[in-house]
Curated annotation (Swiss-Prot):
Subunit structure: In plastids the minimal PEP RNA polymerase catalytic core is composed of four subunits: alpha, beta, beta', and beta''. When a (nuclear-encoded) sigma factor is associated with the core the holoenzyme is formed, which can initiate transcription.
Major location category of this protein: plastid
Pfam families, sorted: RNA_pol_Rpb1_3 (PF04983), RNA_pol_Rpb1_4 (PF05000), RNA_pol_Rpb1_5 (PF04998)
Protein name listed in UniProt: DNA-directed RNA polymerase subunit beta''
Catalytic activity, EC: 2.7.7.6
Annotated family: Belongs to the RNA polymerase beta' chain family. RpoC2 subfamily.
GO MF annotations in UniProt: DNA binding; DNA-directed RNA polymerase activity; zinc ion binding
Biological role stated in the UniProt entry: DNA-dependent RNA polymerase catalyzes the transcription of DNA into RNA using the four ribonucleoside triphosphates as substrates.
Swiss-Prot/TrEMBL cofactor(s): Zn(2+)
Membrane spanning stretches: none
A GO cellular component entry from the record: chloroplast
Length: 1269
């Protein structure tokens, strides 16, 4: 191309006097890149960098403390906000709003204040200091954003706690002013939340990328053109009225699937089919206002297991048509997965600061009186702030009559109108709200209503519905709005059995006796009074067990400083229980120190004439009863887990004591060697002492049998002692092994101790000496070391009836009557009934002990008396206790619970028993308002007396925990408020939502979809609940039942199309696919119905994914998402096999089922029935044709097992399976262009000739070579 330098010189340069920001810079470089190539673009970028840094250096731009200027209007904004909050607080005290509505109003008020301050910051900097470094950096897009600037010079605002809940106390300070201690602590929540979120999301994002790569790794560009006529019609991606991605942004690098006609002259084409869309072509489309364009797409590409060049379009790296062999599946997976971490980076960069964008306010630009149109269709609702409002069912125009003229304002369907008919509205007043999203996600949430004061419950206008669940639990639910009043008073709850000494309406003074309670003994016994750390303990000794014939000693050298119990017959027991420790049934008190049952090695245990019973504490422990013997057949067992190569002896060898049988393993006794191995690993080495005798016949009937002295084992072998005979085989010869038996006698141990039992209830407790063993009859003890076969223990037993009895072990000194001195210490078990009294008692509760030390007490004898005194002066009102019917309770209405309001009797119409609320107009004078809420007790000529009360508003569906007339204390739970909470953006958007879409999960809160084309009719009842019916022209009718507080998106009488959402919530893609498939199945063949329904669902999934990424300002090209969605929507589920070889429940591709059914129909046989299925990326990866790829992803064992059983063949079409096998991957863009075939043939011929010459002639004969050549 020849450039005329004269023309360039003579061209007049443009001069633009405007600020160039980040977006403009991006646009400049993009235009230069596309028009002049990469070299010029790099040069321009370098020049811009030089200019930028040069002028930044000259200007000396840097942030200093002085640059952080706080708008002077901040204090005024905070003042207005505090006034609003005071109004909210008054509304709550008047019970006009619930605690939830108060919380939401408070949150929204602070959020609005924060937004107003943000606008003020922009205005302030723009007007007063446009060259401020902070302002320039943030608004040019160089560094920082508006949220961060707001925190620097505005206010941090509301913060989210670690659970995502909003902390109602906002941070009013900014970083310039500095935070106080409370604000700093609240601030730290958000900072930590940001760090935790980022780290968790990074891991989630990595796993999402792995799944995406796995599902799309075999998508490669394998051909130039699939010759399809199909395509997808593209338009703007919108959410309600808001355009998320404009059409022209989606077109670059795509190929047209159809001719684009000129709207004015249809016979003229703007662009023809299969044209690559460039920037110039987009300008033409904009010029002609083209709103819909049909494009080639990976979703409609007919290439098998790949995508063609034309359907994919241009590569995003260079703007040219994608190369053959490009692994576009991997690129798509990385393009979607990588921004995953950025989806929640917003939380990190704004430090967890909360922002809400659930509704968009509509403000008036003028003041006047609003007038409703006469034909207005609406229904009443209660807003989230507790205000009465209406929702407009059909769009209408409202008149606003100003002093000068009449203005009109049009409000759309679904708008919430906040002002009443004929009411005066101010300029910039919020008169209505519209939802920013058509499908807000709500979730059920609850909040406890807790009383702020003590008093008596009074229900006003509450209708309760009682429900009993399957477990018999009663639940009380309010059916409408109502009030729970707490009438103030001092509440007294008395324990069970307390007797009131006052009557109803008694006037009492402070310190008067109200009730008394007696604590009586439940058993007979001797009293004992002990002084503990901060209480008196009154013990009634019920019974004792003392060991008479044993004394206690302490030996610090032996038994870890434990006490020894020495009996008169020289037996030593070590005490296991602790002094003063509370004992339970079957606890071990002491254990005999004895080695009479100790073995040298392990072996086999056999019991003779002994009964075994499991102990209730431990299943592996047995109690031995009776007199008998334990026969123990010794054998040494080494349990090792090592390779068989370490063995130094063989199984069947006879080894002597201390022989090394394996490396580092020595035997303790002589005997026959038995080695147990598994997979050439030694598990056990067993040495069995005894004598081996060869025998001729099979003596398996004699094996594992005990023979006594004098018994004949076999011919010529008679035993003279107890032996154990075992049948064995040595080198295929039959033998018997006669093994020695050790005999242990088990005798009666009951006579070891002499127990002395005292007390009237002595049968409650007892001590017994018991023989215990850890081995059952016939058990093989696998051990090298010796074990104790029997443990003789002293056990404590108690009766089940002794539940309220405390039993402890005590050491008591025995008094020698002859010398009157204590010489010996005895062990005693004492059972007591214990009652405690604190030293430091409450002022109004006095307890006194009625018994003396050592006094004999009979059953039901009073031991403690407690007196309950009044803390206040006042009138007594006795009530029944709802929670514990046998307990008495009362309330005293003291002078502090009453207030007097001076007002003339003639000026009001109040009656005794009426309830008034704070702020109520009491008389004819409208300026005179009640300063208190309460119940009218008395009316005089000049004043009224009220009992102070607190009202609480409850909403329908509230779970009520209290009863009318019940007495409650401060902090008691009154009710559980149930409400619908809108999920915050962090929860419904971001990575979890992307994962939900790509894994094709059913959303929790789904919307209702139109089942067919028709008209929607919405019916409302008195409570504002809606019922929807859909009616078609074919007289079809479908009724939808809505969830509580589910919003309807369409107005009554509106025409809706099939699959259109008619209520709020997320779309269930599986339901949408089913609806469209059933509809198209009535219109066309199953294969066409499948393709058509897939096309609908694909567009919806594309829109949903783009909405999530765009909400976080992340741009992803449509074609990447289309590649992944193609993999998710390529299978059908077999329902009936027909005459095919397929099975019901099997997943096959659309291409496969189309070919199979075509072949079956051709031979007049029954085709298979199927339906389209939407697979999540994980399921799609596991159902791929390549079992090697699927097995390397998840469920390896199952996939490989199924592949082996079914005899599957992997054709190694994808990248992953080839990498695993170690083959060359079927991808890469280095393919040779085969356009000039003649030149390629000539080069190949010359190369072949040269190679032939080099191999044939190796002699240094240049002449000959030259001649030949």
């Amino acid at each position: 191309m020849v450039i005329d330098k004269k023309k360039v010189k003579n061209r007049t340069p443009y001069f633009l006097n405007r600020i160039i920001e980040k977006s403009e810079l991006r646009e400049i470089i993009e235009v230069v890149f596309h028009k002049n190539g990469i070299a010029k673009a790099s040069l321009i970028a370098d020049n811009l960098k030089e200019i930028g840094f040069g002028f930044a250096t000259k200007a000396g731009i840097s942030i200093s403390i002085e640059d952080l200027k706080i708008p002077p209007n901040k204090s005024r904004i905070l003042q207005i906000t505090n006034q609003e909050l005071r109004k909210t607080e008054i509304s709550f005290k008047r019970a006009e709003i619930t605690t939830i509505e108060k919380s939401q109003k408070s949150t929204d008020t602070w959020n609005n204040a924060s937004e107003a301050l943000k606008d003020e910051i922009i205005k302030y900097y723009r007007l007063t200091d446009p060259l401020n470094p902070v302002y320039m950096m943030a608004f040019s897009g160089a560094r920082g954003n508006l949220s961060q600037v707001k925190q620097l010079v505005g206010m941090r605002g509301l913060m989210a706690d670690p659970n995502g809940q909003i902390i109602e106390l906002p941070i009013l300070s900014n970083f310039r002013e500095g935070l106080n201690v409370t604000e700093y602590l609240i601030s730290s929540y958000g900072a930590r939340k940001g760090l935790v979120d980022t780290s968790l999301r990074t891991a989630d994002s990595g796993y999402l990328t792995r799944r995406l790569v796995d599902v799309a790794q075999d998508i490669i560009v394998r051909e130039i053109d699939c010759k399809t006529n199909n395509g997808i019609t593209f338009s703007n991606i919108q959410n309600n009225e808001k355009i998320i991605i404009p059409l022209y942004k989606r077109l670059i690098g795509r190929i047209l699937a159809d001719d684009v006609k000129n709207p004015i002259t249809p016979q003229v084409n703007i662009a023809s089919k299969n044209t690559l869309i460039t920037g110039n072509l987009i300008k033409e489309f904009k010029k002609n206002n083209i709103q819909k364009i049909k494009l080639r797409s990976p979703l409609t590409c007919q290439s098998y297991r790949s995508i063609c060049q034309k359907c994919y379009g241009a590569s995003l790296s260079d703007g040219k048509l994608v190369d053959i062999g490009e692994a576009i599946g991997i690129i798509a997976a990385q393009s979607i997965g990588e921004p995953g971490t950025q989806l929640t980076m917003r939380t990190f960069h704004t430090g967890g600061v909360f922002t809400a964008e659930f509704s968009k306010p509509i403000k008036t630009l003028f003041e006047g009186v609003i007038k409703y149109p006469s034909n207005l269709k609406f229904h009443h609702v209660r807003t989230r702030h507790g205000d009465d409002a209406i929702i407009i069912e059909k769009s209408a125009t409202f008149d606003i009559r100003t002093t000068q003229s009449e203005r009109k304002i049009t409000l759309e369907t679904g708008t919430t109108l906040l002002v009443k008919d004929n009411s005066f509205i101010k300029k910039n007043q919020v008169i209505a709200e519209t939802s920013t999203s058509g499908r807000l996600i709500t979730e059920k949430s609850t909040k406890d209503l807790i009383s702020n004061s003590a008093g008596e419950i009074y229900f006003s206008d509450i209708t309760i519905e009682e429900r009993v669940d399957r477990h018999g639990n009663l639940t009380k639910i309010s059916k409408q709005h109502g009030l729970i009043w707490i009438l103030s008073g001092e509440v007294y709850n008395f324990p069970m059995g307390a007797n009131l000494v006052v009557q109803n309406s008694f006037e009492v003074n402070k310190g008067c006796l109200l009730a008394k309670a007696l604590i009586k003994s439940r058993h007979s016994g001797i009293s004992r009074i002990r002084c503990a750390a901060n209480y008196y303990a009154i013990d009634i000794i019920l019974g004792t067990v003392t060991i008479r014939n044993a004394n206690l000693y302490k030996d610090s050298k032996l038994f870890n400083n434990n006490y020894l119990l020495k009996t008169s017959n020289k037996k030593n027991f070590v005490v296991k229980a602790l002094v003063g420790q509370k004992l339970s049934h079957s606890d071990i008190i002491a254990e005999l120190i004895d080695d009479q049952y100790l073995t040298n090695t392990g072996g086999i245990v056999k019991y003779v004439n002994l009964k075994l019973a499991k102990t209730h504490k431990d299943d592996s422990e047995y109690t031995l009863s009776g007199i008998g013997y334990i026969f123990f057949i010794p054998q040494e067992t080494h349990q090792i887990n090592k390779d068989a190569s370490i063995l130094l002896a063989n199984s069947g060898d006879y080894v002597n004591k201390n022989t090394e049988i394996a490396k580092g393993v020595f035997c303790k006794c002589s005997g026959l060697l038995e080695i147990i191995k598994s997979n050439n690993i030694i598990k056990e080495i067993i040495i069995k002492p005894g004598v081996v005798y060869p025998v001729s016949n099979n003596l398996s009937t004699f094996t594992n049998k005990i023979f006594y002295p004098g018994e004949k084992i076999i011919d010529n072998i008679v035993t003279n002692k107890i032996v154990y005979v075992e049948h064995i085989k040595l080198i295929n010869k039959s033998c018997i092994l006669i093994r020695p038996v050790n005999q242990y006698k088990v005798s009666n141990t009951e006579s070891l101790f002499d127990f002395v039992t005292k007390g009237e209830n002595k049968d409650l407790i007892s001590l017994k000496v018991v023989n215990k063993s850890f081995f059952k009859d016939g058990e093989v003890i696998k051990s090298v070391k010796g074990v104790s076969l029997v443990n003789i223990q002293l056990i404590f037993y108690t009766k089940p009836s002794a539940t309220a009895v405390t039993t402890k072990m005590e050491f008591v000194k025995d008094l020698d009557k002859s010398t009157n001195s204590t010489s010996e210490i005895k062990l005693r078990i004492t059972a007591t009934e214990t009652t405690k009294i604190k030293y430091k008692q409450q002022k109004n509760i006095i307890s006194q002990i009625l018994i003396k030390e050592g006094q004999y007490i009979t059953k039901d004898f009073p031991i403690i008396e407690t007196l309950f005194l009044s803390r206040h002066d006042g009138r007594v009102v006795i009530k029944s206790n709802f929670k514990q019917k046998n307990n008495a309770c009362l309330i005293i209405i003291s002078p502090s619970n009453k207030k007097e309001i001076y007002i003339n009797k003639k000026e009001h119409k109040l009656k005794i028993g009426d309830f008034i609320r704070v702020g109520d107009h009491l008389g004819t004078n409208k300026n005179f308002k009640s300063p208190y809420s309460g119940e009218v007790l008395d009316i005089n000529d000049k004043l009224i007396t009220i009992r102070i009360a607190e009202p609480y508003l409850i909403s329908p569906g509230t779970l009520i925990h209290v009863n009318h007339g019940e007495l409650i204390r401060k902090g008691d739970y009154l009710a559980l408020l149930v409400f619908d909470k809108i999920k915050t953006g962090d929860i419904i958007q971001g990575l979890p939502r992307i994962e939900e879409i790509l894994e094709a999960r059913k959303p929790r809160e789904t919307c209702h979809l139109a089942k067919f084309d028709g008209k929607i009719y919405v019916h409302y009842n008195d409570k504002g609940e809606s019922l929807i019916s859909l009616e078609s022209q074919k007289k079809e009718k479908y009724v939808y039942i809505l969830r509580l507080n589910q919003r309807v998106l369409v107005q009554s009488g509106t025409e809706v199309t099939i699959g259109e959402p008619i209520t709020d919530g997320l779309i269930n893609p599986h339901e949408m696919l089913e609806i469209f498939f059933e509809y198209f199945l009535t219109q066309t063949s199953p294969i066409q119905a499948t393709k058509a329904s897939f096309e609908k669902i694909r567009l919806e999934l594309l829109k949903e994914i783009q909405q999530v990424y765009q909400s976080q300002k992340i741009e992803i090209n449509d074609k990447h998402i289309e590649v992944i969605i193609r993999q998710m929507t390529s299978k059908v589920l077999i329902q009936e096999r027909g005459d095919t070889t397929l099975f019901p429940g099997e997943l096959v591709t659309i291409n496969q089922i189309e070919k199979i059914n075509s072949a079956i129909i051709a031979v007049n046989k029954k085709e298979a029935k199927y339906k389209p299925v939407l697979l999540g990326i994980t399921k799609a990866s596991l159902n791929t044709d390549s079992f090697i790829s699927a097995a390397s992803f998840q469920e390896t064992t199952r996939i490989l097992t199924e592949a082996a059983i079914e005899g599957k063949v992997d054709w190694l079409k994808g990248l992953k399976e080839n990498v695993i096998i170690g083959r060359l991957i079927p991808g890469g863009t280095g393919l040779i262009s085969l356009d000039n075939k003649d030149s390629i043939k000539m080069r190949l011929a010359l190369r072949h000739k040269k190679n032939f010459l080099n191999k044939t002639f190796k002699k240094k004969n240049n002449k000959f070579l030259n001649k030949t050549y």
